[in-house]
C-alpha cells in the first residue's frame, strides 16, 4: 500500500487554459447546393480571435508519468474562421461558433520544452449565407447547432515559466490541419483548414 501511494504521488497532472490566434493558410472551399452548380474557390480566412461571439481559446489536460517526461493528454481548441474573400454567391461564410478540435495524444519534455502530437475529431457550428439562403445568420435563419463532422490533428511546442509552486505561465505554438463538412441551406460545404497557432496562458500542476 505504501509503495502504491508513493507511485501515485509521483505521477501528476497539469491543466492549462490559453488564448491566442491563428494564421490560416488559403485552402479550397467546395459548396454543393441542390438545384445549383457546385461552387469551388480558394478561401482566405481571418480568425478574429477576440470576437464577435466566443473568442479563440484552448484548454489542455496532461497526465504525466513518474519521471515527469511523458504524458497522455486531451485538448480542445476553439478555432474560428471567417471568409474574407466573399463572392456574389457566398456573401457570408464563417465557423465562428467553433471549428472545434477535440484531441487526444502524447506530450514529451525535451530540453525545457514540451512537444505535443494530437489527433481527434472536429465539431463545427457554421454561419453562412449562400445564394441568399442563411444558416445561423439573421432572425429567420436556420439554426443547425453542433455536429461531429470532421477529423484533424496538431503538432505543437510549448514552454513553461514558473510563477509559484504548482502555477506557471506558458507560451505555445502549433501547426494544425483539419477537414470538416458543414451544412448550407439545401446542401453542404467541405472546409479544410491548415493553420499556424500562437497561444499564451496559465497552468497549474496537481
Task: Name each model feature, range by range.
Residues 9-68, 203-205:
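Short glycine/proline- and aromatic-enriched beta-strand/turn motifs that initiate or cap beta-hairpins
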Residues 11, 53-57, 96-102, 147-153, ...:
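Residues that define the transmembrane beta-barrel architecture of outer-membrane proteins
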Residues 15-21, 74-78, 117-123, 171-177:
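Transmembrane beta-barrel strands of outer-membrane/channel proteins
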Residues 27-29, 39, 45, 158-206:
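Predominantly the C-terminal beta-signal and adjacent terminal strand-loop region
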Residues 27-47, 79-97, 125-147, 180-192:
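Flexible, solvent-exposed loop segments that connect beta-strands
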Residues 58-140, 150-153, 161-166, 203-205:
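Gram-negative (and chloroplast) outer-membrane scaffold detector with strong preference
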Amino acid at each position: 500500500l505504501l509503495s502504491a501511494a508513493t507511485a501515485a504521488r509521483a505521477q501528476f497532472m497539469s491543466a492549462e487554459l490559453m488564448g491566442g490566434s491563428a494564421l490560416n493558410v488559403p485552402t479550397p472551399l467546395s459548396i454543393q447546393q441542390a438545384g445549383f452548380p457546385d461552387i469551388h474557390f480558394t478561401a482566405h480566412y481571418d480568425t478574429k480571435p477576440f470576437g464577435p461571439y466566443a473568442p479563440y481559446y484552448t484548454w489542455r489536460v496532461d497526465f504525466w508519468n513518474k519521471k515527469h517526461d511523458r504524458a497522455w493528454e486531451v485538448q480542445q481548441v476553439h478555432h474560428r474562421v471567417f471568409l474574407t474573400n466573399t463572392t456574389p454567391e457566398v456573401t457570408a461564410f464563417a465557423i465562428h461558433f467553433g471549428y472545434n478540435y477535440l484531441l487526444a495524444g502524447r506530450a514529451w519534455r525535451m530540453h525545457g520544452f514540451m512537444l505535443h502530437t494530437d489527433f481527434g475529431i472536429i465539431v463545427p457550428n457554421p454561419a453562412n449565407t449562400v445564394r441568399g439562403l442563411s444558416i445561423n445568420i439573421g432572425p429567420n435563419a436556420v439554426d443547425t447547432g453542433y455536429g461531429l463532422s470532421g477529423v484533424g490533428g496538431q503538432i505543437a511546442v510549448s514552454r513553461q515559466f514558473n510563477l509559484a509552486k504548482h502555477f506557471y505561465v506558458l507560451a505555445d505554438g502549433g501547426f494544425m490541419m483539419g477537414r470538416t463538412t458543414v451544412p448550407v441551406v439545401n446542401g453542404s460545404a467541405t472546409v479544410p483548414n491548415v493553420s499556424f497557432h500562437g497561444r499564451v496562458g496559465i497552468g497549474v500542476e496537481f
